[in-house]
Amino acid sequence: MAPRSLYLLAVLLFSANLFAGVGFAAAAEGPEDKGLTKGGKGKGGKGTKVSDDDTNGTDPDPEPEPEPEPEPEPEPEPEPEPEPEPEPEPEPEPEPEPEPEPEPEPGAATLKSVALPFAIAAVGLVAAF
């Protein structure tokens, strides 16, 4: 049976690598502004930036409602048209080529950079037990 210090060391390694992996994932999102966004229905759609001129869904200058128009006179029934000839079926369009995957930005976290600390921690845990 391994000494208690090896168990503690393995847990500490795992925790450190876990936090490092979370840091890599956060760095991958980029330094863009994480300002407030509003969701749901309303101006701008879901997930748009909240602006200072937001009027909370009320229209500051409501337009007056138009007056109802008089009903038009009924028109005589048109004569039935002859049946048109069936159109030929269109040919199937060729499938577009898939777009190549864009290369990751420099310094962005990749699967390899995030998974490597977890793999090291897992090996450490297995070795400790």
Curated annotation (Swiss-Prot):
Q: Where are the sequence repeats?
A: 59-60, 61-62, 63-64, 65-66, 67-68, 69-70, 71-72, 73-74, 75-76, 77-78, 79-80, 81-82, 83-84, 85-86, 87-88, 89-90, 91-92, 93-94, 95-96, 97-98, 99-100, 101-102, 103-104, 105-106
- Membrane topology qualifier: Lipid-anchor; GPI-anchor
Q: Where is the composition biased (Acidic residues)?
A: 53-104
**Covalent lipid sites (GPI-anchor amidated glycine):** 107
Q: Which GO terms describe its cellular component?
A: plasma membrane; side of membrane
Q: Where in the cell is it found?
A: Cell membrane
Annotated region (Disordered) at 27-111
Which InterPro entries does its entry note? Trypano_PARP
- Keyword set for this entry? Cell membrane, Glycoprotein, GPI-anchor, Lipoprotein, Membrane, Repeat, Signal
- The residues that carry sugar chains are 56
The task this protein performs is described as: Major surface antigen of procyclic forms.
Q: What is this protein called?
A: Procyclic form-specific polypeptide A-beta
**UniProt source species:** Trypanosoma brucei brucei
